[in-house]
């Protein structure tokens, strides 16, 4: 599996803001938006392009645009925070949704929503979720995408745990990973260490509805 770690001073500074427990919801959202745009920029590096004629105020020339913009698929809830940054970089992208919550007792994903095109054959898919911990949620999402015909899937995560990266690599699913960092371990509650806490709670506040 191809893994790209975005090693850049601006990415590192935004990640530090997100890690800091003193950062409030608004500050966390702002840092996530900046870092999300950087990761989408890197994930888009190899997208196919096409040229077309364009006229500047001075002369005619050739412009460039994406040949086939990807579909952005956030894993709800925390993945929603990465949609606007992705669309700021690729405004003509479509958006699908996969909803999953974590069972706090088993640490396993509990799916509750799928809103995706029936056929993803030939489509490039960016699956976005701030955290890759055990890999359970992301593996479930990527399998859903692959079952609908997707063979070009990029997982975009802010922070990835080595355990989740290994699970993704060993799955055999058609996926590459773009991330800002790979953290070494998970704690007994399956939170990434050092990580940044619960990304959904830090984006939107505590979830008070059991799914």
From Swiss-Prot:
Cofactor, free-text remark: Binds 1 Mg(2+) ion per subunit. The magnesium is bound as Mg-PRPP.
Keyword annotations from UniProtKB, A to Z: Allosteric enzyme, Glycosyltransferase, GTP-binding, Magnesium, Nucleotide-binding, Transferase
Pathway: Pyrimidine metabolism; UMP biosynthesis via salvage pathway; UMP from uracil: step 1/1
Enzyme class: transferase
Activity regulation behaviour: Allosterically activated by GTP.
Cofactor(s) in the UniProt record: Mg(2+)
Entry binding sites for 5-phospho-alpha-D-ribose 1-diphosphate: 77, 102, 129-137, 198
Catalytic activity reported: UMP + diphosphate = 5-phospho-alpha-D-ribose 1-diphosphate + uracil
Keyword Glycosyltransferase included in the entry's annotation: yes
GO BP: UMP salvage; uracil salvage
GO MF annotation, one: magnesium ion binding
Residues involved in uracil binding: 192, 197-199
EC number: 2.4.2.9
UniProt similarity note: Belongs to the UPRTase family.
PANTHER family, A to Z: ADENINE PHOSPHORIBOSYLTRANSFERASE (PTHR32315), URACIL PHOSPHORIBOSYLTRANSFERASE, CHLOROPLASTIC (PTHR32315:SF4)
Job description of the protein: Catalyzes the conversion of uracil and 5-phospho-alpha-D-ribose 1-diphosphate (PRPP) to UMP and diphosphate.
Name this polypeptide is given: Uracil phosphoribosyltransferase
Organism field: Corynebacterium diphtheriae (strain ATCC 700971 / NCTC 13129 / Biotype gravis)
Gene: upp
């Amino acid at each position: 599996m191809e893994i790209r770690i975005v090693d850049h001073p601006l990415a590192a500074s935004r990640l530090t803001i997100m890690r800091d427990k003193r950062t409030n919801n608004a500050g966390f959202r702002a840092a996530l938006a900046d870092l999300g745009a950087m990761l989408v920029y890197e994930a888009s590096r190899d997208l196919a392009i096409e040229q077309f004629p364009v006229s500047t105020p001075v002369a005619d020339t050739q412009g460039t645009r994406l040949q086939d913009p990807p579909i952005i698929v956030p894993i709800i809830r925390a993945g929603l925070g990465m949609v606007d940054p992705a669309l700021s970089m690729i405004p003509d992208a479509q958006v699908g949704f996969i909803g999953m919550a974590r069972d706090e007792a088993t640490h396993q994903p509990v799916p509750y929503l799928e809103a995706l095109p029936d056929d993803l054959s030939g489509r490039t898919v960016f699956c976005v979720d701030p955290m890759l911990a055990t890999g359970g949620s992301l593996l479930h999402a990527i399998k859903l995408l692959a079952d609908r015909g997707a063979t070009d899937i990029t997982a975009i995560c802010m922070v990835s745990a080595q355990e989740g990266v290994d699970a993704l690599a060993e799955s055999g699913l058609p996926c590459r990973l773009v991330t800002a960092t790979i953290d070494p371990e998970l704690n007994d509650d399956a939170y990434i260490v050092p990580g940044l806490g619960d990304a959904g709670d830090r984006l939107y506040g505590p979830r008070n509805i059991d799914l």
